[in-house]
Amino acid sequence: MQIKKDDNHQELDKYNHMSLQKILAISGKPGLFELKIQTRTGFVAESLLDGKKITVGMKSNVSLLSEIAVYTYNEEVKLAEVFKAIATKENEGPAISHKEDNAVLVNYFREVMPEFDEDRVYPSDIKKIVNWYNMLQAKGLISIESLNQEVKKQAAE
């Protein structure tokens, strides 16, 4: 299948094929970032919120979304699987607001991931996960199909 590309389609195509392995959460910085290039002293990342590029040093506390997992009573579940569960519940639409009351967020998360370990997954964690999901969903980066591929890719690693 060939896709005709113009500026608008390239942007959409780029995002639809973007892996969670290129999406970063940087401690102390709001939002999520796409890893652009690695440098000798760190890397350059682009904000998914405003598109601004920043340089991040090696000493910064950075997490790849592909490396984040949620504790359950049996195992750790990769974030891609959590996003897939939210996307399934919301029919690929937005989740509730991360600004909801903690009790509302915990109840929502219990619907999505009934087996999550409530002693080790805090409301602040749920807030971040819901916020990240909504950011990615607003950018068109959330689809059950792409998350299925992400889950398969991570399982193979």
Residue ranges and their predicted role:
Residues M1-H17:
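N-terminal amphipathic/basic-hydrophobic helices that include classical n-h-c signal peptides
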Residues H17-S97:
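The feature represents the first ordered module of a protein
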Residues N8, N16, N61, N74, ...:
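Detector for Asparagine
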Residues V104-E157:
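C-terminal charged interaction modules
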Residues D7-N8, K52, M58, L141:
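Intrinsically disordered, low-complexity regions
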Residues T72-E76, A95-N102, D119-I126:
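Conserved phosphate/pyrophosphate-binding and hydrolysis machinery centered on Walker-type P-loop NTPases
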